[in-house]
A protein has these predicted regions:
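Helix-loop-strand module that forms the ligand-binding subsite of alpha/beta enzymes
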Residues: 57-135
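N-terminal beta1-alpha1-beta2 submodule of the flavodoxin-like/Rossmannoid cofactor-binding fold
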Residues: 1-83, 89-93, 156-182
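Short, functionally important structural connectors and interaction interfaces within domains
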Residues: 2, 30, 40, 97, ...
Length: 182
């Protein structure tokens, strides 16, 4: 089973890379489960401007960056979206990355880790709404991080509560993916 951990911000000084690293540690060591970091900063996706919706493109993308993104997403069985809350929503770069693809997301399972001044709750709910267009299941357990108390210098300050939330979320994600693959 392969879980893609999507670092959903490309902003300078962002926290998503550090949070994604912490999430990867929470996935590590599980038998039969591997994780891969899908850092949107490394894909350099153009703004969505395809001549037709992705579902109609049949994976025939013109941009090499989109082709690489498509392959990376297609290779995963499920995802953990690590996203900050920007103006009560998801970052534009993450929405753009989601919008570029369609069949690659279909029938896969997702989970969300949000962070922000209000713990990223609104961004997670918006992300769930977006993902339900494609995914079979966006699991309910999530991790909510405060940028004031749970993150310092771009890294998660682990606590017993956060470690428990992460374990609960990853356990749920792995269980749903395993049932789907059975």
């Amino acid at each position: 089973m392969k879980i893609g951990i999507i670092a959903g911000s490309t902003r300078q000084g962002r926290n998503s890379a550090g949070v994604a690293h912490w999430v990867a540690q929470g996935v590590a060591g599980r038998e039969g489960v591997e994780s891969v970091l899908l850092d949107l900063a490394t894909f350099e996706l153009p703004m969505f401007d395809a001549p037709m919706p992705p579902m109609m493109l049949n994976r025939k993308y013109e941009s090499d960056a989109v082709k690489a993104w498509s392959q990376a997403v297609d290779d995963c069985d499920g995802f953990i979206f690590v996203l900050p809350e920007y103006n009560r929503s998801v970052p534009a770069v993450l929405k753009n990355a989601i919008d570029w693809l369609a069949p690659e997301w279909m029938d896969k399972t997702a989970a969300c880790v949000g962070y922000g001044s209000a713990n990223g709750i609104r961004a997670v709910e918006h992300c769930r709404s977006i993902l339900t267009n494609f995914t079979r299941h966006v699991i309910r357990p999530q991790v909510a991080l405060s940028i004031f108390t749970d993150i310092s210098d771009g890294a998660v300050v682990p606590s017993e509560r956060l470690q428990g939330d992460l374990k609960n979320m990853v356990d749920g994600l792995v269980a749903v993916i395993a049932r789907r693959q059975a």
